[in-house]
A protein has these predicted regions:
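Conserved alpha-helical segments that form or flank metal/cofactor-binding pockets of metalloenzymes
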Residues: 36-63
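Short, structural beta-strand-to-alpha-helix junction motif
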Residues: 34-35, 74, 173
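N-terminal "assembly arms/tails" that initiate or stabilize quaternary assembly
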Residues: 2-40, 44
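Structured surface interface patches that mediate subunit assembly and partner/cofactor docking
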Residues: 1-3, 20-21, 25-31, 54-64, ...
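A short, structured beta-strand-centered segment in the mid-to-C-terminal lobe
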Residues: 67-85
Length: 215
């Protein structure tokens, strides 16, 4: 799946899922956020991408502005904005391809946050692999807390941290790999997975970028 198709697919699913829900529903995997605030973020990302406001992309202040700018709007107004801007972002995805894959990663991650908030599992398709390809590259370049190699295999994607032996490895379903790599699982849950090797020295690797596993 290409980035444009992935973004269009995930956006469509999120808009469908958000239709008719209680805007004030908490999002457990995004502490302090409601569904409206989650949708304000993804809608705000679309607007910022189109306006070239990406110098601070992914930072807390950047996200906070997106949410605050839509605080006085209804959920329908927020999603209505995304309905209007989404097709323009699709065109940008066609032009930039994998150069905008971080957008897919963010949107896929938040689809799962939304699904968790309303108890509607799903969304496990090729868009997740587009997201994982970007995540694997970003994760690989982050700080290595110990010697050896940490390897997560998920579908056609391999996320590798470090170099050499010993190798600590695991095979996960793509959505499970996304959850583990985006702070949606606690360190105790990560450690309890069926690792081949001792993952404990690698646990700091699961705190990276904006992602902090819950207590």
């Amino acid at each position: 799946m290409e980035t444009a198709e992935a973004y269009q697919t995930v956006r469509g699913r999120m808009l469908d899922l958000a239709s008719g829900v209680d805007a004030a529903t908490p999002v457990p995997t995004c502490p302090g956020w409601t569904i409206k605030e989650l949708l304000s973020h993804v809608t705000g990302v679309a607007a910022d991408v189109l306006n070239g406001n990406i110098a601070e992309a992914g930072t807390d202040p950047w996200v906070a502005v997106q949410v605050a700018a839509r605080a006085d709007r209804s959920l329908d107004e927020v999603t209505g904005e995304w309905v209007e801007t989404g097709p323009q972002v699709d065109e940008l995805c066609v032009a930039l391809g994998d150069g905008i894959a971080q957008l897919i990663f963010d949107t896929v991650t938040h689809e799962q946050d939304l699904r968790g908030a309303i108890g509607q599992p799903g969304g496990d398709d090729a868009a997740v692999e587009v997201a994982l390809r970007w995540a694997a590259g970003a994760w690989a370049g982050s700080e290595v807390p110990t010697s050896g190699t940490l390897l997560i295999r998920a579908g056609s994607v391999e996320a590798v941290r470090g170099d050499g032996g010993p190798v600590v490895a695991i095979d996960l379903e793509p959505l499970d790999a996304m959850a583990v790599m985006t702070g949606r699982r606690s360190l105790s849950e990560v450690q309890a997975l069926a690792w081949d090797g001792d993952v404990e020295p690698w646990l700091p690797a699961f705190t990276w970028g904006p992602f902090v596993p819950p207590a």
